[in-house]
A protein has these predicted regions:
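N-terminal lobe/hinge region of extracytoplasmic solute-binding protein
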Residues: 36-87, 118
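Gly/Pro-rich hinge or "lid" segments in bacterial periplasmic/extracellular proteins
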Residues: 69-71, 163-222, 230-231, 335, ...
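Extracellular/periplasmic solute-recognition and catalytic clefts
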Residues: 120-123, 127, 141-143, 189-200, ...
Length: 549
C-alpha cells in the first residue's frame, strides 16, 4: 500500500552544494548504495506486501516471471524466457529459464512457481497481491509438464494477466530459508529493527550485461530506516545517502536551485494522497460517529470543504494537481475525464450537511442528536506533506464548524491500526501505483480485499454500491476487450466520485534526488522512480560518502 503543519517546511541549515561523490564518465562495479526507508518493513514475505517499505525490499530481492519496464512500459522476460496467453485470457503458459538457483543455492524449477501460485491464491493467506488475480469463483489449475514449463489456468479470464506477474516474487518450494531465499539481484543479509536493512549482491542472479558481465554491479544496498524527511535530505546533501526515491516538493525546489543535476522531476505520477473514514462496524468509537462516516452526504460535504488547490499550491509548491478519483490524469487511457471536479465550496458543504440533519450553530457543527462534529485524523509521523495537509484540512473544516484533531504515528503503528485493530476514526495516506493497468487495484476495490481500507475483508458487500463495484471489477477483470474494460472502469470511477469512500486530495509529481555519483540512473514516472533499474546502477570511482570539508 503503499503509498504522503501548516507552516512551510524549512531545513535546519541553509542549503549549499551537496557533498556528493563526483561521478566519473565510467563507473565501476562494487560498492554500497545507500538510501532510506521511511519506516520499518512490515514483512519480508513478498506475497504479503502492503506497505512501501516492504515493497522496496520485494522489488530489489524478488525474482519475477515477467518484468514491467518502468521506463519503456514494455513487458520483458524475467525468470520466464517466453510465455503465451490463451485467446480466452484464462490460461498462461510459461517457459522457464533452465539452470537457475535461488540465493542460497537451491535449484529453481516449475515446482517453485506452482508452490508460489498456490500460496498466492490461498484465501487463508489474504495476499493483497493475490487479490489482483481474482476474476471469478473457483480455484486455479496448475500443470507442470516439465521442470522448465508451467501452465496456469484461472477460473475466469484475467485482463492484463501478463502485467500482474511483475508483482509476484517467486518463492522456493524446498529451501529451508523459505521466503528469504530469493531470485532477484539482491538478498536480505541483515536487518536491525529501527536502524537498517542490508541487502547483498545475489551471486546466483541470472542476468548479465551486454558484455556478459554478471549483474548486479553493486556489492550491496544499505537501506537506513529514517522516518524524518528533513534528516533524510540533510543526509543526502552531506553525501551520506545516494538517492531519495520520493522527494518532498519544497525540498525539491531548494535542491534544484543548489544542485540541478541531483534533482529530478519526471512529471505527474500515478500516485495519489487521500483521506478516508473508518466504517468498520466493530471499531471502538461512538456509534453516532459511525453513522456520520457511513453517510454519503457527510463524506461529500467534507470533500467540498477541502481546498485542494491550496494543498497543491502550498504543500506541494505547484508540483501536484488536485485529485478527484482513483486514476491519475497521467494514466491517459484509464482516466475518466468526465468525472466532476468538485471545487472548494464551504457553503455548498453546509447545505449538503443540512439535508441530512446537521446544523451549523454558533460556529459549531452538530448532528441531529446535538453531538458536536469532531474527529481525529491519523497520518504517518515524519511525513511533512501529510502533516501539513492535515493541518490545512483542520483549517478548512473549521470554517464549517468541524473540529479536526491530528495524531501522527510511526508507520508500523499506523499500519497496525488501519489493518488490524481499527483503532482510528480517519486516516490520511496515499497509494503508490506501480503499473498503468488498473487491474492492479483489485486489492483496493473488492469489498473482500485487504486494502479496502474504509471497511476491509467484508464477507459480503456492506452496501449496494460496493456490490456494484465488485461486479464491475470482476467484469472488467474477465473482459478481453479494452473498450469493455474502459467502460466498466469509467463506471467504477463514477461510483467512487458519487460515494467518496476515499476523499482524493492530490496527484503529486514523481520527484526524486539522485547523486551524480550514481551512474546509470534513469528516473521514471512509475515507482520505484529512482532505483527501478538497480541491477545496472554503478557508483563513480570515488565511493566515499563522507561530507566535503
Amino acid at each position: 500500500m503503499i503509498r504522503h503543519v501548516s507552516v512551510v517546511l524549512s531545513l535546519a541549515i541553509a542549503l549549499c552544494c551537496p557533498a556528493l561523490a563526483t561521478a566519473q564518465s565510467a563507473g565501476q562495479s562494487g560498492g554500497e548504495l545507500h538510501f532510506c526507508l521511511h519506516g520499518e518493513p512490515k514483512t519480508f514475505n513478498p506475497l504479503l506486501v502492503e506497505d512501501g517499505q516492504s515493497e522496496t525490499i520485494r522489488y530489489l530481492t524478488g525474482g519475477v516471471l515477467i518484468r514491467f519496464n518502468r521506463q519503456t512500459q514494455a513487458l520483458e522476460p524475467g525468470l520466464a524466457v517466453s510465455w503465451k496467453t490463451s485467446p480466452d485470457g484464462r490460461t498462461i503458459k510459461f517457459n522457464l529459464r533452465a539452470g537457475l538457483h535461488f540465493s542460497d543455492g537451491t535449484p529453481f524449477n516449475s515446482e517453485d512457481v506452482a508452490y508460489t501460485m498456490k500460496a498466492l491464491m490461498d484465501p487463508q493467506l489474504h495476499s493483497p497481491t493475490g487479490d489482483s488475480f481474482r476474476s471469478g469463483e473457483g480455484q486455479i489449475a496448475i500443470q507442470t509438464p516439465s521442470a522448465d514449463s508451467i501452465v496456469i489456468t484461472f477460473p475466469a479470464p484475467v485482463a492484463g494477466l501478463e502485467r500482474l506477474f511483475d508483482q509476484v516474487a517467486i518463492l522456493s518450494a524446498h529451501s529451508p530459508k523459505k521466503e528469504m531465499a530469493v531470485l532477484g539481484p539482491f538478498y536480505v543479509a541483515d536487518y536491525t529493527p529501527g536502524s537498517y536493512v542490508l541487502l547483498r549482491r545475489n551471486t546466483n542472479y541470472w542476468k548479465k550485461d551486454k558484455e556478459g558481465k554478471p549483474l548486479p554491479y553493486l556489492d550491496s544496498i544499505r537501506l537506513d530506516i529514517q522516518l524524518n524527511h528533513d534528516i533524510e535530505i540533510l543526509r543526502f546533501r552531506r553525501g551520506e545517502i545516494h538517492l531519495i526515491n520520493s522527494l518532498d516538493a519544497d525540498l525539491f525546489d531548494r535542491l534544484q536551485k543548489e544542485s540541478p543535476a541531483a534533482a529530478h522531476d519526471a512529471g505527474p505520477s500515478l500516485d495519489s494522497e487521500f483521506v478516508w473514514f473508518n466504517q468498520v462496524p466493530t471499531a471502538a468509537f461512538p456509534e453516532y460517529k459511525k453513522n456520520w462516516f457511513r453517510t454519503t452526504e457527510f463524506r461529500k460535504a467534507i470533500s467540498l470543504a477541502i481546498n485542494r488547490a491550496d494543498l497543491s499550491r502550498i504543500v506541494y509548491v505547484g508540483h501536484a494537481q488536485p485529485a478527484y478519483g482513483p486514476i491519475s490524469p497521467a494514466n491517459h487511457f484509464w482516466f475518466n475525464s468526465a468525472l466532476p471536479t468538485q471545487q472548494y465550496d464551504s457553503a455548498a458543504a453546509l447545505r449538503l450537511l443540512a439535508r441530512v440533519g446537521f446544523r451549523f450553530d454558533g460556529g459549531i457543527l452538530r448532528d441531529s442528536m446535538g453531538n458536536r462534529v469532531e474527529f481525529t485524523v491519523i497520518t504517518s509521523a515524519g511525513n511533512k506533506p501529510r502533516e501539513q495537509m492535515v493541518a490545512m484540512i483542520q483549517q478548512d473544516l473549521s470554517q464549517i464548524g468541524i473540529k479536526v484533531n491530528m495524531v501522527t504515528l510511526d508507520f508500523p503503528s499506523l499500519i497496525e491500526r488501519i489493518t488490524r485493530t481499527y483503532d482510528y476514526e480517519a486516516c490520511l495516506l496515499g497509494f503508490t501505483n506501480a503499473g498503468l493497468d488498473p487491474n492492479s487495484q483489485m486489492n483496493v476495490w473488492l469489498s473482500s480485499a485487504e486494502n479496502h481500507q474504509w471497511n476491509p475483508r467484508q464477507s459480503r458487500p456492506a452496501t449496494a454500491w460496493e456490490a456494484e463495484i465488485d461486479r464491475l471489477m470482476q467484469a472488467q477483470a474477465s473482459a478481453t476487450s479494452d473498450k469493455k474494460r474502459k467502460a466498466d472502469w469509467d463506471r467504477v470511477q463514477q461510483i467512487v466520485a458519487e460515494q467518496q469512500p476515499f476523499i482524493y486530495l492530490i496527484n503529486r509529481d514523481a520527484m526524486s534526488a539522485i547523486s551524480p555519483a550514481v551512474i546509470g540512473s534513469a528516473p521514471s514516472v512509475l515507482d520505484p522512480h529512482a532505483f527501478w533499474n538497480a541491477e545496472v546502477l554503478r557508483l563513480g570511482t570515488d565511493l566515499s560518502l563522507g561530507a566535503q570539508k
